[in-house]
């Protein structure tokens, strides 16, 4: 029951709304026709806001007169026209100018707003293109400047690196040169000392040989380089001299791979031989101490 009532109310409202809409539309129709009807006695061109051809021709003539040189104008002014022909001349000029007015001028007057908008759009595009070209040129200049600065920085770093390498090379060459000079000086000093040792008398040589042998016996284990420095000899000369003394039986011992000579006395050799023959016997304590020193 309630549903039927609601449906009836909705239908009634719909009928009222449609009726009001139709009445409003009917009242608005005469007003639209009256507004659309052209005004009597007023030219269509005037109603549309389009200027008359005479006005257009007059404007065109004024523009042409502004472009005419002053001399022809003065010559024309010197011959005044007849008074009776002035009106006909004006009308003829109006008609002639109207005939000479290009159709584009009329269209410009009719489409002034559209053309102005179009020209403004073109001008805006032109300005935009010029701005883009300007920005592009500025960007190219900036990139070229950055590239030049980067290349300059790379050249500077390369120059610094080259100077550093040259300095290291010169320092190395100087160090090697000094080492070579010191080596030559040392070599010359050894040569002089060797010559002085070899050119000494027999007594001095015998004394030096005795001191050499006694030095080995006292130290048991001697470093060959230290022995060479002590007696102002070369290391190879020390080795040769020890081998000669071993060959004639003056001293006994061994030269190890560490550049040392280990002296072994006759008593120690006998003790070693006895320990080898007797397994229960222990070797002399002085031998291992001397061997491991």
From Swiss-Prot:
Coiled coil: none annotated. Residues 52-84 have a biased composition (Low complexity). The chain crosses the membrane at residues 3-23. One of its GO terms (molecular function) is ubiquitin-like protein ligase binding. One of its GO terms (biological process) is protein ufmylation. Pfam families: DDRGK. It is a single-pass membrane protein. Residues 24-293 are cytoplasmic. The keyword Endoplasmic reticulum applies. Belongs to the DDRGK1 family. Interacts with Atg9; the interaction is transient. This is DDRGK domain-containing protein 1. The gene is Ddrgk1.
């Amino acid at each position: 029951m309630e549903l039927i009532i609601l449906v009836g109310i909705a239908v009634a409202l719909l009928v009222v709304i449609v009726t009001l809409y139709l009445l409003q539309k009917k009242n608005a129709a005469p007003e639209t026709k009256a507004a659309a009807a052209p005004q009597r006695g007023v030219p269509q061109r005037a109603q549309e806001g389009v200027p008359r051809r005479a006005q257009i021709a007059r404007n065109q003539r004024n523009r042409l007169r502004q472009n005419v040189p002053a001399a022809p104008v003065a010559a024309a002014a010197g011959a005044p026209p007849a008074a009776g022909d002035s009106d006909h001349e004006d009308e003829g000029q109006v008609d002639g100018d109207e005939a000479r007015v290009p159709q584009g001028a009329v269209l410009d007057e009719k489409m002034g707003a559209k053309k102005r908008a179009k020209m403004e759009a073109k001008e805006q595009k032109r300005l935009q293109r010029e701005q883009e070209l300007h920005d592009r040129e500025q960007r190219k200049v900036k990139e070229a400047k950055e590239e030049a600065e980067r290349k300059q920085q790379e050249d500077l770093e390369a120059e610094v690196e080259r100077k550093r390498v040259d300095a290291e090379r010169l320092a190395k060459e100087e160090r090697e040169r000094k080492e070579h000079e010191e080596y030559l000086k040392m070599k010359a000093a050894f040569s002089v000392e060797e010559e002085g040792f070899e050119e000494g008398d027999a007594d001095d040589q015998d004394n030096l040989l005795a001191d050499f042998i006694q030095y080995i016996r006292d130290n048991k284990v001697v470093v060959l380089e230290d022995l060479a420095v002590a007696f102002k000899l070369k290391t190879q000369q020390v080795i040769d001299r020890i081998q000669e003394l071993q060959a004639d039986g003056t001293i006994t011992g061994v030269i190890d791979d560490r550049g040392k000579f280990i002296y072994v006395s006759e008593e120690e050799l006998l003790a070693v031989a006895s320990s080898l023959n007797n397994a229960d016997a222990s070797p002399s304590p002085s031998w291992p101490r001397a061997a491991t020193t």
